[in-house]
């Protein structure tokens, strides 16, 4: 998450409060997800340990520490790009928070990393939203909320660069997963002889017109 300079701690506290209201407890909560395997849970705990060892502040949300593969959300402030959680996809309930000084600064942070699968903008004016769309790259974008572009059946969904290739959902998904077969059938009147040597001035002019768009006049240049 990118927040204005000086707002990281207040943002982390607000996120923790909202999480606690939604999930008062994590352990044994059937409405709260689990990490898919113990190996991935260990990887997430190692990311948090690395960040804390390098100076980050961890704010664990909820009223309990979770158990097994049920891990509560952890908001991480005072992060830097040397931490492992800033160098790879997290795939877990960890939210790093970076501070920015201006919209230009925030967009520079986005451009400096790999192109994300999704980008979310909250509280931006229409003009700033237009700037974000023009000056950053992302697989998809939601303004004033999160994730909703994924659920629109008539919007293409997919990544760009490291976050994936291709688009899916609706017509875009049908086209992506279908093969459009190109077929050419030559008819008898097709002037195929023009494509065989020897070439005259007419063929030269036609070729220049087709490939360059400006057919020269005059005799052919000597070889």
What is each residue range found by the language model?
Residues 3-115, 121, 127:
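NAD(P)-dependent aldehyde/semialdehyde dehydrogenase
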Residues 70-223:
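Conserved C-terminal structural/oligomerization subdomain of aldehyde/semialdehyde dehydrogenase
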Residues 1-2, 145:
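Short internal beta-strands
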